[in-house]
């Protein structure tokens, strides 16, 4: 297999192990309304999805306007940033891995369901923004993961064929999204087990032992 045309990264749970803090933020959001959110419900209904889709699920059966979605999103994400600010750090091995990709002249992009404020928050705390030639976020798509739209849009903006790209994901909807776009997928087990992510081409605990040659070997041997 030749070098990938691009390496496309999800953000939450893939480049930072922050899903425990998203869970805490959503639980605080729920508690304000006298409700309870379990970790199982988070993994099944929230992780990897856009805030618009999540808010519609949280308030299923209730009338929800775009203004409501924006207000609830701001509330929850402010909680998340307040909770996580003192703890944010990259997944082990991320920075050396980005350096490797850069040294091989592989374009690097981000395709995240997250909002711009959270992406800026990430870049402020983790100094990797110069590696990324493109960032596509959840406000730029109509259909969230597991729909392939965000990955096909990212490839289109990069000017590359999706089937020549490798995506890095941590969630089941994210893996499904990248696969549906025709990409090779490397899953990171920060949130889900290897068994839950078994549809991916390769599964890793973090980026610490990954090399470009090893990545190619992993995704070729499926």
Regions found by a protein language model. Give the residues of each.
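Conserved catalytic-core motifs of eukaryotic protein kinase domains, centered on the activation segment
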Residues: 20, 112, 121
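Asp-based, Mg2+/Mn2+-dependent phosphohydrolase catalytic module
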Residues: 1-5, 95, 99-102, 115-222
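Residue-level detector of anion-binding/catalytic polar loops
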Residues: 36, 107, 184
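Short, flexible loop segments at the rims of nucleotide/cofactor-binding pockets, characterized by
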Residues: 84-89, 113, 180-182
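Short, contiguous strand/loop micro-motifs
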Residues: 13-14, 83-85, 110, 138, ...
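Conserved SAM-binding loop
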Residues: 15, 44, 90, 108-111, ...
């Amino acid at each position: 297999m030749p070098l990938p045309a691009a390496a496309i990264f999800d953000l939450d749970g893939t480049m930072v192990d922050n899903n425990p803090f998203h869970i805490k933020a959503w639980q605080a959001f729920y508690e304000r309304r006298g409700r309870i959110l379990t970790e199982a419900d988070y993994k099944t209904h929230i992780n990897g999805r856009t805030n618009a889709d999540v808010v519609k699920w949280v308030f299923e059966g209730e009338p929800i306007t775009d203004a409501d979605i924006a207000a609830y999103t701001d509330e929850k994400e402010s909680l998340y940033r307040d909770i996580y600010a003192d703890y944010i750090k990259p997944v082990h091995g991320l920075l050396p891995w980005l350096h490797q990709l850069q040294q091989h002249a592989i374009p690097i992009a981000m395709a995240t369901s997250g909002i711009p404020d959270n992406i800026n928050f990430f870049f402020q705390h983790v100094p990797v923004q110069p590696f990324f030639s493109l960032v596509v976020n959840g406000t730029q798509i109509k259909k969230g993961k597991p729909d392939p739209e965000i990955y096909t849009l990212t490839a289109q903006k990069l000017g590359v064929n999706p089937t020549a790209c490798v995506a890095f994901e941590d969630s089941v909807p994210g893996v499904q999204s990248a696969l549906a776009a025709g990409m090779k997928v490397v899953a990171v087990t920060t949130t889900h087990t290897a068994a839950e992510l078994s549809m991916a081409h390769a599964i890793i605990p973090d980026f610490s032992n990954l090399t470009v040659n090893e990545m190619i070997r992993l995704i070729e041997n499926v």
